[in-house]
Amino acid sequence: MDPSTLFLLLIIAAGIILLAVFFTFVPVMLWISALAAGVKISIFTLIGMRLRRVIPNRVVNPLIKAHKAGLDVAINQLESHYLAGGNVDRVVNALIAAQRANIELTFARCAAIDLAGRDVLEAVQMSVNPKVIETPFIAGVAMDGIEVKAKARITVRANIDRLVGGAGEETIIARVGEGIVSTIGSSDNHKKVLENPDMISQTVLSKGLDSGTAFEILSIDIADVDIGKNIGAILQTDQAEADKNIAQAKAEERRAMAVAQEQEMRARVEEMRAKVVEAEAEVPLAMSEALRSGKIGVMDYLNMKNIDADTDMRDSFGKMTKDQNEEDHK
């Protein structure tokens, strides 16, 4: 092969490689699209984005959209927001929606809301079209002891000025639930709540529950009211059961004390019987001593034995008569 021809082929291959690298590194088509949309961007600006590891279409496409919407947004603002980790496309969409709805919203404010983790586009849309938050059934107990369950629908509008640092929907639901419980608990009778559920919404709405939140409460409507358990009767039943258990425990304690006292008295009876037996055992000794010392004679002793025998005989007769009478009664 001719050396000149080989050199020419090498130059052509090198040119093709350089063009491929150029079109890969430099988004020429994106640059042409921006120029066609009337957005003036230097090709070196796009190259600088590549060097700063910024995806050019993530910045240029929102810039074209903002330019077509008539927004005064610089490419440096969009690039800095992208580098900060924000969603450039969502911020531009929020600015366009705010402009169409005549809501004052600057790029700096919108970017701050986006970096705070809030969906700024949803917030703008919610400012135009309020959102309805439905609470679960919230139970409260009226003064007559009847449980009343209420479900509320809260219509809120986003407050863009308080999106950064303001509380969310959970706080709104918790505060409304607290107001419902307080209103039901202050009612003398559960029938008043059933007859006039607007009393709950009016009382709750007058407390300014949206302070410190990212929302403005427009209305609170009671969607459903239901009757729950008779808490007062349940508490009284539980108290009566507890009183019964206490009384049973005290009665058992008294019974145990009575049994213990009975056992103690039986022990004392046995002790007295032992003393009687001991005393009876000393009688023969005393009799023998009296006979030995001559204090009583033999005839006196025999008379005493006869008297004892007569006494035992009368006792046996009495027992026989008593047993016979009991059998006759049976």
From Swiss-Prot:
**Protein's cellular compartments:** Cell membrane; Membrane raft
List the InterPro entries hit by this protein, alphabetically.
Answer: FloA (IPR022853)
Q: Which residues cross the membrane?
A: 6-26, 28-48
Q: Which NCBIfam families match?
A: PRK13665.1
Q: Which family does it belong to?
A: Belongs to the flotillin-like FloA family.
Its biological purpose is as follows: Found in functional membrane microdomains (FMM) that may be equivalent to eukaryotic membrane rafts. FMMs are highly dynamic and increase in number as cells age. Flotillins are thought to be important factors in membrane fluidity.
Protein name in the entry: Flotillin-like protein FloA
